[in-house]
Amino acid sequence: MLLPAVVLALISGATGLALAMHYPLGPAVMTALVLAAWGAFFAWPQLWLLLVPALLPIIGLAPWTGWITFEEVDILILVVAASGYARMAWPVRTNTTGDGSSRDAMPGMSGVSVLAWLLALLFAASTLVAVGRGFADAGGFSFGWFQGYLEPMNSVRLGKSIFLALLVLPLWQSAVRQQPERAQRLLAWGLMLGLAGAAMATVWERTAFTGLLNFSTDYRT
């Protein structure tokens, strides 16, 4: 077992489960979906490359949940991380190499240069400083599930993306090392599906509010 992978799996799983249990629209249903997704992503570790970019434009339900600090995509990425790092901690032996040799389905986290990691960590550190400044300007940190844009948790909303990206970066490296062509193909399909979903949502929104071909009425998509 890799201790860092175990720790990341536990933290990601616990955080994702906590968000699911406090989800405003049916916490029991969301918790059940999280548990099912854990199993799916553990069984098919590259599935997230298709689903995350495909679902990203269409799973934001903030108008109905009232959440802006936390989003459905946060839960999805935390589930991906929990399953991926669990598989990395308890690797499954598979034959994926061209010569038939066996290797771990989830190898280590290497593959990115020290300079690249240093730059990423420096950017993450600068984000933490910015989040701290945001807390200070909002009158100090106070936690709340339904805070708005002028309250402390808005800094968390703005700063979390870099940390979610860094969280899944080793999983992307692992997928590319195992089956580079398949990983890139799944990601490409996911991006295309996400673009199609965003385009359809835009067409629906304009049709619903102004009319698809009405370019005279003031409206911001």
Task: Give the positions of each predicted feature.
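Alpha-helical transmembrane segments
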Residues: 2-15, 33, 45-57, 117-122, ...
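Short, amphipathic, aromatic/basic-enriched membrane-interface segments that mark the entry/exit
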Residues: 1-2, 16-25, 41-45
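Transmembrane alpha-helical segments
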Residues: 34, 38, 78-85, 164-176, ...
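N-terminal hydrophobic segments of proteins, predominantly signal-anchor/transmembrane helices
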Residues: 39-159
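Membrane-interfacial helix-loop-helix modules of multi-pass inner-membrane proteins that assemble, modify
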Residues: 62-63, 127-152, 182-184, 196-221
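Alpha-helical transmembrane segments of polytopic membrane proteins
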Residues: 2-6, 22-34, 68-79, 150-163, ...
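Hydrophobic alpha-helical transmembrane segments
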Residues: 19-28, 135-139
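Interfacial loop-to-transmembrane-helix boundary motif in multi-pass membrane proteins
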Residues: 48-49, 102, 107-123, 162, ...
